[in-house]
Curated annotation (Swiss-Prot):
NCBIfam families: PRK05286.1-1, PRK05286.1-4, PRK05286.2-5, pyrD_sub2. PANTHER family: DIHYDROOROTATE DEHYDROGENASE (QUINONE), MITOCHONDRIAL, DIHYDROOROTATE DEHYDROGENASE (QUINONE), MITOCHONDRIAL-RELATED. The keyword Cell membrane applies. Catalyzes the conversion of dihydroorotate to orotate with quinone as electron acceptor. Gene3D superfamilies: Aldolase class I. HAMAP family: DHO_dh_type2. It catalyses: (S)-dihydroorotate + a quinone = orotate + a quinol. One of its GO terms (biological process) is 'de novo' pyrimidine nucleobase biosynthetic process. It is a peripheral membrane protein. Its cofactor is FMN. The gene is pyrD. One of its GO terms (molecular function) is dihydroorotate dehydrogenase (quinone) activity. This is Dihydroorotate dehydrogenase (quinone).
Length: 337
């Protein structure tokens, strides 16, 4: 009940501002009042192996909550089994003009067109070095807006090279709808070229550092069955370590007539649940358990978390559900899956 009171106050603010203030508050140490309401519930130990790594539990943060790795320690206190930071790019960039995030409150949805706003990969590395979290940190990487699609692989390779020694796993974001033509990297020759080069770089760095860092590809929920089958074949062919399903959707049809429904950008939250879960089901069949799936999109309850896992996800992630239901949702999910 306490969180829903706080939520009413937060929802009076512009969404991006509310997000910033919430994380800043989380980052303040030694607040006994805050600890009582948010950290009190005991979380069961449920370790699981995925991508060759041991996760404390199946639930992690989705990319976007902590773009620059400034709140790793604070988020870890909430009980997450892993933290995924980013999306970060080789160089800092401001992203798209504000306002660029909008709530669809009646549907528990969020539309965003952030545009990979971040302080760059070097800043993220400094923040990871400063953190005390001993669990798994995934690093989600993307390309700079100024980098052409033809040269985009270079941006991913730069980020992989720099972050390799500091990441538990690396997530390749080629599915954000808010960077022009980025989703084209999911298709044909561009996709094959990307997979070949990042796998080659991974092998080089594995040999150099004697450390294997898994690589996951994050895909769109707006792909057809045929496209998902084709993607699955290439993921298997190039021995990619995992697939993250899914990013936000451009399909706003479920929001017809609602406030903010006409805003451009990717839709996340509850309206994405069915679409992302369906994508997981198709991937699960086409991947034949050769590559694990990390499920994300619309998880707002124990049941929706279970749906992702029953559809084939090994790990799951949340973001919008946390906005609408608060930190206690984390503990409920972990203790019941």
């Amino acid at each position: 009940m306490f969180y829903y009171f706080i939520r009413k106050l937060l929802f009076l603010l512009e969404p991006e501002k509310a997000h910033f203030l919430t994380l800043k508050y989380l980052n303040i140490k030694n607040i006994q009042f805050f600890d009582f309401f948010f950290y009190k519930t005991i979380i069961l130990s449920k370790k699981i192996k995925c991508m060759g790594l041991i996760f404390d539990n199946k639930l992690g943060t989705a990319a976007g909550i902590d773009k620059n790795g400034e709140y790793i320690d604070a988020l870890s206190k909430l009980g997450f089994g892993f933290i995924e930071v980013g999306t970060v790019t080789p160089l800092p960039q401001v992203g798209n003009p504000k306002p660029r995030m909008f709530r669809i409150v009646s549907m528990e949805g969020i539309i965003n067109r952030m545009g990979f706003n971040n302080l760059g990969i070097d800043n993220l590395i400094r923040n990871i070095k400063k953190s005390n979290f001993k669990g798994i940190i995934g690093v989600n990487i993307g390309k700079n807006k100024s980098t052409s699609l033809e040269n985009s692989v270079d941006d991913y390779l730069i980020c992989i090279e720099k972050i390799y020694c500091y990441a538990g796993y690396i997530a390749i974001n080629i599915s954000s709808p808010n960077t022009t033509n980025l989703r084209n990297l999911q298709y044909g020759i561009l996709f094959k070229k990307l997979l070949y080069k990042i796998k080659k770089k991974q092998k080089e760095l594995h040999k150099k550092y004697l450390k294997y860092v898994p690589i996951a590809i994050k895909i769109s929920p707006d792909l057809s069955i045929k496209e998902l089958v084709d993607i699955s074949k290439q993921l298997i062919r190039y021995k990619i370590d995992a697939v993250i399903a899914t990013n936000t959707t451009l399909d706003h049809s479920s929001l017809f007539g609602l406030k903010n429904s006409s805003e451009q950008g990717g839709l996340s939250g509850l309206p994405l649940q069915k679409k992302s879960t369906n994508t997981i089901s198709i991937l699960s069949k086409s991947l034949q358990k050769k590559i694990p799936i990390i499920g994300v999109g619309g998880i707002n309850s124990i049941n929706s978390a279970k749906e992702k896992i029953e559809s084939g996800a090994t790990l799951i992630q949340i973001y919008s559900g946390l906005v609408y239901h608060g930190p206690k949702l984390i503990k409920k999910i972990i203790n019941h899956i």
